């Protein structure tokens, strides 16, 4: 693990078994009701366009030139933190006919997407925001329609009611609808300035001066109040079994049971 900047770690895992190199940026932020929706939208809008690639056509053309490189984004819960991830996967340089490093070009592209988004007057572009909001709302409603997923999410919200982990990872439909280009821009600034960041590369080799390029981006930022993703508030022991019934017009019922235990640093105990 390499220290890149304050609250920013770099990790290179050498692996020759695969034909591709994977580069990921992982941002850890506190899981809070008032910021969960904006944060969850960030990885998706950041990997959809940028200043250099302002629309899907320009972005897709660049990915095709990188031999079909693939962009991915996700927003998950990690204990009491929200984990925002952006990744790019590209074939290793030894499989290409180009003289320039394909992996280096892909890493530069992802870095630009994160640090140079398509914004104007301290706000994300309205069309981009509305598109991602629509997709997020469809995702939330889709989880409700998928009863197994809905049952699991309801279990977690009941088990951890009043705690950070009980918050829905993408927020509610109402919270997503309230997002504006300005509020999303503020969330982006907060992510870059206060998130704990882990940059991970898995592949045959590290792109030339990769960590130096990342460090240069963070050097220009005022990093403060860095999220400590190791802190996790312990759940109070349950005095009795809590049973929740929820009636719905479905053909098949779902039974979900949840058990909570303490977190341990010892590998043997965790296993």
Give names to the regions the model predicted.
Residues 60-61, 116-140, 227-236:
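Acidic/histidine-enriched alpha-helical segments
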Residues 12-38, 189, 196, 215, ...:
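His/Glu-based metal-binding/catalytic segments typifying zinc-dependent metallopeptidases
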Residues 49-52, 94-97, 116-125:
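Short, polar/flexible loop-turn hinges at active-site or ligand-entry regions and domain interfaces
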Residues 11, 19-39, 57-112, 148-171, ...:
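M16 family metallopeptidases and their MPP-like homologs
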Residues 108-120, 216-225:
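A common structural junction motif
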Residues 1-7:
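Short, Gly/Pro- and small/polar-rich lid/capping loops
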Residues 39-47:
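Active-site SXXK
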Residues 181-217:
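Non-catalytic, conformational "gating/processing" segments within enzyme and secreted inhibitor domains
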């Amino acid at each position: 693990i390499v220290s890149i900047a304050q609250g920013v770690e770099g990790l290179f895992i050498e692996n020759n078994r695969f034909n591709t190199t994977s580069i990921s940026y992982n941002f850890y932020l506190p899981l809070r009701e008032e910021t969960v929706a904006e944060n969850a939208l960030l990885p998706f809008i950041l990997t959809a366009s940028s200043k250099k690639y302002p629309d899907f056509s320009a972005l897709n053309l660049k990915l095709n030139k990188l031999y079909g490189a693939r962009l991915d984004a996700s927003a998950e819960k990690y204990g009491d933190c929200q984990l925002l991830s952006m990744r790019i996967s590209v074939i290793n340089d030894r499989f290409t006919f180009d003289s320039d490093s394909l992996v280096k070009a892909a890493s530069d592209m992802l870095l630009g997407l994160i640090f140079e988004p398509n914004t104007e007057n301290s706000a994300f572009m309205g069309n981009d925001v509305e598109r991602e909001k629509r997709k997020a709302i469809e995702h939330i409603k889709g989880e409700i329609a998928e009863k197994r997923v809905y049952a699991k999410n309801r279990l977690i919200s009941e088990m951890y009611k009043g705690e950070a982990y009980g918050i829905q990872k993408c927020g509610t439909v109402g919270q997503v609808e309230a997002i504006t280009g300005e509020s999303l821009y503020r969330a982006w600034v907060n992510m870059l300035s206060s998130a704990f960041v882990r940059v991970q590369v898995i592949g045959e080799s590290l792109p030339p001066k990769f960590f130096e390029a990342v460090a240069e981006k963070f050097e220009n930022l005022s990093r403060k109040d860095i999220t400590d993703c190791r802190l996790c508030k312990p759940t109070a022991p349950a005095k009795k079994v809590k049973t929740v019934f929820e009636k719905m017009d479905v053909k098949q019922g779902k039974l979900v049971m949840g058990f909570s235990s303490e977190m341990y640093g010892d590998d043997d105990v965790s296993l």
